[in-house]
A protein has these predicted regions:
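Non-catalytic, mostly N-terminal accessory regions of nucleic-acid modification and defense proteins
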Residues: 1-200, 300-324
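SAM-dependent methyltransferase catalytic region
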Residues: 167-373
Length: 373
C-alpha cells in the first residue's frame, strides 16, 4: 500500500530512482565502513553460492533488531535457499536502521524500499559481487572519505548528460544533477590553506615552521599582512567555516583536516578536536538532500578514522539541506496548527512573509536572499 501511494504521488520513474539511489549509497557506505574496520564484513560472501555473511549469521540465529512483522517474515524465509535475495533485503534494511552512522547520516528507509532491491543483486557480476571483488577501487580508496562523493558523481553522470542535452531552463529536480561538480583536490587545498591556514599563521606566526612545509599550496604574500588587516580571533573555536553549496563535502573534508591539525598542534586530544570542529567550526548547506547525506557520512568516516569512539554517531557535523517549501495555499492552515492561540496580526504577517520567501528554497539553495523585517 505504501509503495502504491508513493507511485501515485511521485510517479514510477521517480520511485525507481529513489530506490536505486537508496540502495546504491547505503551498500557502498556499508562496504566503506567494512573496509575501515568499523563494522563486521556483512556483505562478504561465505561460500561459492554467494551467500552474504549477514544472511549466514541470521541462519545461525544472529539477527539484527527489526520490527516483529519483519522478523516473522524473515523466519519464514530463512530455510528456503531460493529466497536468499529476499532474506538479504530484510536483513540489510534492518542493519541500516540499526547502525548509528548509517541511520543518522542517511535516515530511515521507506517500508517498501526492500521490495525494490534488484533481483540480480547477488548474482555473479551483480552489484554486491562488484563491491566485493572490484579491481577498480583499492583498499586505499576505501579509506578515503571522498570516495563516496566520487562514486555519487559517477552515479549521476548519465542523468547530468540528459539534463544538459535537453538545454533550456533546468527544472528544480534537475538542478542537483546539473550542478554537482567535484572540485580537483589541489584547488580545494589551495582555497583552504590560503583562508583558514593564512588566518591562523597571521595570528600565530610562530607556527609557520610547523605548517608551511605541509601546506604546499600556501601563497606567501610579497609583504607581511598589515596588523589592521589581520582577521583576529580568540580561540580556534571562533573560526567558523561555511560551504553553502557543499555537495558531497569535499571542501568540508579538507577544512576538517586542516582544523584538526591546528587543534592537535595546540594540545587538544583527538576526541576534543573532532567534537570542537563539528560543534563550532564547520557548517555545510546543499539543496540536494542526497549530497548532504554523503557529506555527513564522509565527515563521520573521517572522525572515526581519528577516533573510533565516534562510530556511535553521538555527535554529527552540522550539514543541512534546504527544506521543501510548504505550498502557499497551506501556509495559513499550518500557522493555525502551530499556535495554540491566534497570533497577532504582525506575527502572522511576518511568518507568512517568511514562508513566501522560502517558496524557492529547494531550487535556489543558499543564493536565496531572505529579509523579514
Amino acid at each position: 500500500m505504501a509503495l502504491y501511494k508513493r507511485v501515485q504521488q511521485k510517479g514510477i520513474k521517480e520511485v525507481y530512482e529513489e530506490a536505486a539511489y537508496t540502495w546504491f549509497n547505503r551498500l557502498v557506505a556499508i562496504r566503506i565502513l567494512m573496509k575501515n574496520q568499523l563494522i563486521e564484513p556483512v556483505l562478504d560472501y561465505v561460500d561459492a553460492a554467494r551467500t552474504p555473511r549477514i544472511v549466514d549469521e541470521a541462519r545461525m540465529g544472529r539477527i539484527p533488531q527489526m520490527q516483529e512483522r519483519q522478523r516473522q517474515l524473515l523466519m519464514e524465509l530463512l530455510d528456503d535457499d531460493s529466497k536468499i535475495t529476499e532474506q538479504f533485503a530484510i536483513l540489510v534494511t534492518a542493519f541500516c536502521h540499526e547502525n548509528p552512522i548509517l541511520f543518522k547520516c542517511f535516515g530511515a528507509m521507506s517500508d517498501y524500499t526492500e521490495l525494490l532491491l534488484p533481483n540480480d543483486i547477488l548474482t555473479e557480476g551483480g552489484f554486491i559481487d562488484l563491491l566485493n571483488h572490484t579491481e577498480f577501487i583499492t583498499d586505499a580508496d576505501f579509506h578515503s572519505p571522498e570516495l563516496i562523493g566520487w562514486l555519487y558523481q559517477f552515479y549521476i553522470s548519465e542523468r547530468k548528460d540528459e539534463v544538459f542535452a535537453k538545454k533550456g531552463k533546468f527544472e528544480a529536480d534537475e538542478i542537483p544533477a546539473a550542478t554537482q561538480i567535484f572540485t580537483p583536490n589541489w584547488i580545494v587545498k589551495y582555497m583552504v590553506q590560503n583562508t583558514i591556514g593564512r588566518i591562523y599563521l597571521d595570528n600565530n606566526p610562530s607556527a609557520a615552521s610547523e605548517f608551511k612545509p605541509k601546506w604546499k599550496y600556501l601563497v606567501e604574500p610579497s609583504t607581511p599582512t598589515p596588523k589592521e588587516a589581520i582577521y583576529k580571533y580568540k580561540e580556534l573555536t571562533d573560526l567558523l567555516v561555511g560551504d553553502l553549496a557543499c555537495g558531497s563535502g569535499h571542501i568540508l573534508n579538507e577544512c576538517f583536516d586542516l582544523l584538526y591539525d591546528l587543534y592537535i598542534y595546540e594540545g587538544y586530544s583527538r576526541r576534543e578536536a573532532v567534537e570542537y570542529i563539528f560543534t563550532n567550526n564547520l557548517r555545510g548547506i546543499d539543496l540536494d538532500t542526497r549530497a548532504k547525506q554523503l557529506a555527513t557520512f564522509a565527515l563521520m568516516l573521517k572522525a572515526c578514522q581519528k577516533d573510533s569512539a565516534f562510530a556511535d554517531a553521538h555527535i554529527l557535523p552540522k550539514v543541512l539541506n534546504m527544506p521543501t517549501p510548504i505550498p502557499q495555499e497551506q501556509v495559513s492552515d499550518r500557522l493555525k496548527e502551530f499556535f495554540r492561540e491566534t497570533p497577532s496580526n504582525q506575527i502572522h504577517k511576518d511568518l507568512t512573509a517568511a514562508f513566501e520567501l522560502m517558496q524557492e528554497a529547494d531550487s535556489l539553495g543558499s543564493i536565496d536572499r531572505k529579509s523579514v523585517v
